[in-house]
């Protein structure tokens, strides 16, 4: 099995592949994939994002390997040392919530705790 890939079986006995990564002690699921190669590509992309310097806009070309929400979460974790499973990126005095690749909402940082209370981290 390739690095970062785990075999899984659905209730109907269909085989699929899970990909995950552990970074700074945090276990992060990267998703489910139909092939081992695709799951490994997601793992490789996550490794590159977490060790690189790409901005969110520069990293969106990786959506063929990872969901854009996961890209935002990983880059936020790399840059701000806080893993948020929703597509939130912390900035100085405000944060961005990405509805899609081309749709970014900006909120005052004081509102962050409200949004975090809605999710389980």
Labelled PLM ranges:
Residues 48-52:
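Sec-exported extracytoplasmic/periplasmic mature domains
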Residues 39-43:
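Short beta-strand segments enriched for Tyr within beta-sheet-rich domains
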Residues 73-108:
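Compositionally biased low-complexity segments at domain edges in trafficked proteins
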């Amino acid at each position: 099995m390739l690095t970062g890939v785990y075999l899984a079986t659905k209730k109907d006995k269909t085989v699929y592949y899970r990909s995950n990564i552990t970074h700074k002690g945090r276990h992060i699921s990267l998703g489910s994939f139909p092939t081992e190669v695709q799951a490994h590509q997601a793992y490789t992309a996550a490794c590159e994002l977490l060790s690189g310097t790409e901005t969110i806009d520069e990293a969106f070309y990786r959506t063929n390997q990872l969901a854009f929400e996961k890209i935002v979460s990983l880059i936020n974790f790399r840059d701000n040392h806080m893993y948020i499973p929703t597509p939130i990126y912390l900035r100085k005095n405000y944060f961005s919530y990405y509805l899609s690749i081309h749709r970014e909402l900006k909120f005052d940082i004081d509102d962050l705790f409200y949004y975090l209370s809605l999710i389980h981290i």
